[in-house]
From Swiss-Prot:
RdRp catalytic domain segment(s): 501-687
Any one of the GO BP annotations: DNA-templated transcription
Location relative to the cell: Virion
GO molecular function, one term: RNA binding
Source domain of life: Viruses
Keywords: Magnesium, Nucleotide-binding, Nucleotidyltransferase, RNA-binding, RNA-directed RNA polymerase, Transferase, Viral RNA replication, Virion
Primary site of residence: virion
Organism taxonomic ancestry: Viruses, Riboviria, Orthornavirae, Duplornaviricota, Resentoviricetes
Protein name, as recorded: RNA-directed RNA polymerase
InterPro entries, per database record: DNA/RNA_pol_sf, RNA-dir_pol_4-hel_dom, RNA-dir_pol_luteovirus, RNA-dir_pol_reovirus, Rotavirus_VP1_C
Swiss-Prot/TrEMBL cofactor(s): Mg(2+)
Function recorded in the entry: RNA-directed RNA polymerase that is involved in both transcription and genome replication. Together with VP3 capping enzyme, forms an enzyme complex positioned near the channels situated at each of the five-fold vertices of the core. Following infection, the outermost layer of the virus is lost, leaving a double-layered particle (DLP) made up of the core and VP6 shell. VP1 then catalyzes the transcription of fully conservative plus-strand genomic RNAs that are extruded through the DLP's channels into the cytoplasm where they function as mRNAs for translation of viral proteins.
GO cellular component terms, semicolon-separated: virion component
Source organism per UniProt: Rotavirus A (strain RVA/SA11-Patton/G3P[X]) (RV-A)
Length: 1088
């Protein structure tokens, strides 16, 4: 068994090191004789420990268990009251504690003052500005670091250097914390006033960030960066990350391209050996030096020096150090401001009348025309989605907050809740549901606010609008997104593309006569000037569209949408400031509407077009591409002559001057070789991503459990690692141990083993080998998976009570009746289940389910239930396949250049051998004919699981299913009677399997699964025509080959001789695969 169990056992002896501590390992086996020995062994261990006897004899007597059974969990047992952290910490607190400089930050509360100075009384205190928002504590983090340090104090050679670097940094952290004492957390992992009052306010979040940074130190460079960030972030809680990452926007413009990848006509990446010189005017260097100066003024020394040194030869080879600095800067933690300051930030902008009206008009018209272009077709054809927009909105209503808490009655149960879905049900039950009236958000009913915190940027506010806004906008926005999906300009939405495609798009046209203009418009989006022209453009577009139809329902939809825009032009927000709630007129665009992303992209595109049309008066160029991606836009301009410093200087100044005429405070840059936007940056013809996901601090608290957060932590670690920021894996595993342990009583704790946490069951948290998703096929693995599946999903009394109430039932019935033309149990049950699942975001319900889950888990970890679940998982399928494959050694040459320098070596190697993919594999069934047929006539969107169920029904049942959703009988008949139907069966099965195998997550999303180089390693003689079977055999083989290569850095080839008789059996099995949701799949999904 793996490294995890070994570390677990060492960790337990490190934590519970007193005489009274006992560790009892619990084993299980699928072999019934051995299983009985496991049970005996366990009960004797308990017996002995109760009587204070040693367990050593038992370990000898039951050697067969230890050798042959599988470790299930470790029960640990200690009467020691847990003040061990303080004791251990003293050993490391040998340095000088940090002293915060209390004048660094502009806002008083952002200075790291004593808590009692910022909040004189407990009533005034709030932890919202420093809450780590993660279900693990500072003391656990300290323990994890000290465990690592103790374990490695005897390392030698290079490893000793790493130890010394980390020890040195930890001394700073330990000394500072030791000066004030370790803050103790409460049961909810929050830090209360009496704990914090005599300590610096930001101590906890700073210490978490510092630990995260020091455990990511390997090289000397890492050490210098980390040391500087740890020391300075103790005082500077506001601008440090921004200062350190600012230079990147210029650095990308300084590296020559010598060979790069470009997108070809087939949308694949293709190597191009072009050479493009970086042309940099002096003004750019002045700006860069100014940035470096600002860094030095803030007390940074080593980081600006590294950048300065790199500037000497500006080589792409040494650029990864710049990328590293850029990534590290985010790990100083989130900047959390008071809501008032976050809102006032946008309102501080000086409003001038001195703007170019002509440009504003052009901007508004472009928005208008784009809105019309997006919605023209659906409006002219009276699209059913626009007719049934209200139903569509209700079906996809979220369970987020509706902005106010209300008392709701469900049957005999009365609850208080803020959730949108519950408010809708309650309003319907009480005749208050009026989707045709969009409530005002003016001074009488100001908008409550949410917040979005990001490292290195100011806190942004989010509107929490009444659900009527969502219903009014949903259908129209969906139509806009469908348009954006096949429009290349919208990089974020473009059909199944990924970031690599966008990378090839930029490099495609770069040459000695082109320049690329890139702008960060996040400031513009939330500026006051944007609001009138922005909303007016949309309104004008809607007015034009209204003249294109006579359908009353479509007109109503457009009208309600228009009303949301009108209302939002006069918006007020409510901000709690101490005990008072301030109402402020807010004239800017904030997130929170359904249209936020789509509308921002439209406005962005309009903005860059407006600017380009202005500067084309002065310069003659052809616009090769325009792209908008979130808050950023970029364009490649081609000139008739070679680009010179002077030209760049002129274009750059003209662009800035043009933006200034609209009073748009944006960062606009021009370069010949690279760009930097929020999502990715291109330098020297290579693509980089910012590895800036915080591990030990979270943005906000949600209702995820400790297990969920452990999986999210692991998932974040993986994403960072792929992007070039590596945290020590042993440390991550130690955090997983801490976060997945279950307390039974004060002195009893249960720690699950690696097998439990890595088998793909409903409890999976991480992979035993980074980047490789294993599907266990050994008897013990399948046995434990079956056992976990027998733990049916947990019920909740509150949820059942709500679901039984007439309020809930009537709501679900109402949805079904509006949607269905005849009885359809699959859909009705689906709606009821979805609605019931939405209740999970109501805390009491999720708590109830969590408790039930934990008690079931506790039983399970002490003795697995023998239960033969009849469900088939993907593991069963792979287990059937495995025996028929024979392995032999193979060789694949490296044939592609590197284009993503931050990748770990083993992943890089695979891309260099088989190539990368620029598209997402379709894994939701949306491309199938049946899915398209349904969306042609109905607003209902079946999930991949539902399609998978439906497509395997009898033909007449499929017909009934379709007819009930309003598909005309003739179309349903044609579908079932045609070849398309059998093609669909295969296609949906394919999507479903891809979905189960997480093919679009982790590092698998980077590999070209259809690579001819990969195909030639796999030989499967063609027997009988069952494409589904051929597909699964090939896919299994590809995963095996790739996983082997990730692990060993070499290739194997597979030969499969699959008997014809088995094929039909396998094919039947493939229609009964159960999908498993786990914290692990959740975390993947959570990544995007």
């Amino acid at each position: 068994m793996g490294k995890y169990n070994l570390i677990l056992s060492e960790y337990l002896s490190f934590i519970y090191n007193s005489q009274s501590a006992v560790q009892i390992p619990i084993y299980y086996s699928s072999n019934s004789e051995l299983e009985n020995r496991c049970i005996e062994f366990h009960s004797k261990c308990l017996e002995n420990s109760k009587n204070g006897l040693s367990l050593r004899k038992l370990f000898v007597e039951y050697n067969d268990v230890i050798e042959n059974a599988t470790l299930l969990s470790i029960l640990s047992y200690s009467y020691d009251k847990y003040n061990a952290v303080e004791r251990k910490l003293v050993k490391y607190a040998k340095g000088k504690p940090l002293e915060a400089d209390l004048t660094v930050n502009e806002l008083d509360y952002e200075n790291n003052k004593m808590t009692s100075e910022l909040f004189p009384t407990a009533e005034e205190y709030t932890d919202s500005l420093m809450d780590p928002a993660i279900l693990t504590s500072l003391s656990s983090n300290l323990n994890a670091v000290m465990f690592w340090l103790e374990k490695h104090e005897n390392d030698v050679a290079e490893k000793l250097k790493v130890y010394k670097r980390r020890l040195d940094l930890f001394t700073i952290v330990a000394s500072t914390i030791n000066k004030y004492g370790v803050p103790r957390h409460n049961a909810k992992y929050r830090y209360e006033y009496d704990v914090m009052k005599d300590k610096p306010y930001y101590l906890v979040t700073w210490a978490n960030s510092s630990i995260e940074m020091l455990m990511s130190v390997f090289s000397h460079d890492d050490y210098l960066i980390a040391k500087e960030l740890i020391v300075l972030s103790y005082s500077n809680r506001s601008t440090l990350a921004k200062l350190v990452s600012s230079p990147m926007s210029i650095l990308v413009a300084l590296v020559d391209i010598n060979g790069t990848f470009i997108t070809n006509e087939e949308l694949e990446l293709e190597f191009s050996n072009k050479y493009v010189r970086a042309i940099v005017p002096d003004q750019t260097f002045d700006e860069l030096n100014q940035m470096l100066d600002n860094m030095r003024k803030a007390g940074l020394v080593d980081i600006p020096k590294m950048i300065q040194d790199w500037l000497v030869d500006r080589s792409i080879e040494k650029f990864p150090l710049m990328a590293k600095i850029y990534s590290w800067s985010f790990h100083v933690g989130f900047r959390k401001q008071k809501m008032l300051d976050a809102a006032l930030d946008q309102l501080k902008t000086e409003y001038t009348e001195n703007v170019d009206d002509e440009m504003y008009r052009e901007y508004t018209m472009l928005i208008r025309d784009e809105v019309v272009k997006m919605l023209e077709e659906p409006v002219k054809h009276d699209d059913h989605l626009l007719r049934d927009s209200e139903l569509a909105g209700l079906l996809s209503m979220s369970s987020a907050s509706n902005g106010e808490s209300r008392q709701l009655k469900f049957g005999r149960k009365t609850i208080f809740s803020t959730k949108k879905n519950m408010h809708v049900m309650d309003d319907m039950a009480n005749e208050r549901y009026t989707p045709g009236i969009i409530p005002p958000v003016n001074v009488d009913k100001p908008i409550p606010l949410g917040r979005r915190d990001v490292p290195g940027r100011r806190t942004r506010i989010i509107f929490i609008l009444p659900y009527e806004y969502f219903i009014a906008q949903h259908a129209v926005v969906e139509k806009m997104l469908i348009y954006a999906k096949h429009t290349r300009e919208y990089a974020e939405f473009y059909s199944q593309s990924n970031q690599l495609l966008s990378y090839g798009d930029v490099t495609r046209f770069l040459s000695n006569n082109t320049m690329v203009l890139y702008t960060d418009v996040s400031q513009w989006d939330s500026s006051q000037h944007n609001t009138q022209p922005f909303r007016k453009g949309i309104i004008m577009g809607l007015d034009i569209l209204a003249n294109m139809t006579n359908d009353a329902k479509v007109l109503q939809t457009l009208n309600l949408y228009k009303q949301t825009q009108i209302n939002l032009m006069d918006s007020y927000v409510q901000i709690p400031d101490g005990n008072v709630i301030k109402k402020i007129q807010y004239g800017a665009v904030a997130s929170g509407e359904k249209q936020t992303k789509a509308a921002n992209s439209i406005a962005n595109l309009a903005l860059i077009k407006t600017v380009l049309s202005r500067i084309s008066n002065k310069h003659s160029f052809a616009t090769k591409i325009i792209r908008v991606d979130g808050d950023d836009n970029y364009a490649v301009l081609q000139f008739n002559t070679e680009v010179t410093k002077q030209m760049i200087q002129d274009v750059s100044n003209d662009v800035r001057e043009t933006y200034a005429r609209m009073n748009a405070k944006v960062k606009a840059l021009v370069s010949t070789v690279g760009i930097e936007i929020a999502k990715r940056y291109i330098a020297g013809g290579k693509i980089f991503f910012r590895a800036g996901i915080n591990l030990l601090n979270n943005e906000k608290r949600g209702q995820s459990t400790q297990w969920d957060q452990a999986a999210i932590l692991y998932s974040n670690y993986i994403v960072n690692r792929l992007r070039g920021f590596e945290t020590d894996r042993e440390f991550i595993l130690t955090k997983i141990m801490q976060m997945t342990s279950v307390a039974i009583t004060g002195s009893l704790r249960l720690f699950p083993s690696e097998r439990v946490l890595t088998t793909n069951s409903t409890f999976k948290v991480f992979d035993s080998e980074d980047f490789i998703i294993e599907y266990g096929t050994t008897v013990d693995e399948v046995y434990i998976q079956r056992a976990f599946m027998s733990l049916s999903s947990q019920k909740s009394g509150i949820a059942d009570e709500i679901a039984a109430s007439s309020t809930f039932k009537n709501y679900v019935t109402r949805l079904s009746e509006q949607l269905l033309f005849s009885k359809n149990n699959i859909v009705s049950r689906g709606i009821a289940l979805t609605e019931k699942a939405k209740l999970n975001s109501y805390a009491p319900i999720s708590l109830e389910k969590r408790r039930a889950q934990i008690s079931a888990l506790l039983t399970m970890l002490q003795k697995p239930v023998t239960f033969k679940s009849s469900k088939i998982t993907i593991n069963d399928i792979l287990r059937d396949i495995k025996p028929f494959f024979t392995v032999s050694d193979a060789h694949l040459p490296i044939q592609y250049q590197k284009f993503m320098p931050t990748l770990p070596d083993n992943v890089q190697y695979i891309i260099q051998c088989i190539g990368s993919r620029t598209y997402q594999i379709e894994d939701d069934g949306s491309k199938s004919a049946i899915s398209r047929l349904i969306s042609k006539y109905s607003v209902y969107k079946p999930s991949i699981e539902e399609l998978y169920k439906v497509i395997s029904l009898h033909e007449n049942e499929i017909q009934l299913y379709l007819i009930s959703l309003g598909i005309p009988k003739i179309d349903a008949d044609t579908y079932v009677g045609s070849k398309i139907y059998s093609r669909d069966k295969y296609r949906i099965l394919e999507s479903y399997v891809y979905n189960l195998l997480s093919i679009n997550y982790g590092c698998y999303q980077l590999f070209d699964f259809n690579s001819p180089d990969l195909e030639k390693l796999i030989r499967i003689p063609f027997k009988g025509k069952i494409p589904a079977v051929t597909f699964i055999l090939h896919l299994y083989a590809k995963l095996e080959v790739i996983n082997y290569a990730i692990k060993n850095g070499s290739w194997i080839s597979l030969f499969c001789n699959y008997p014809k008789s088995e094929m039909i059996k396998l094919w039947k099995k493939m229609w009964n695969i159960t999908s498993l949701r786990s914290p692990y799949t959740n975390a993947n999904f959570f990544q995007e």
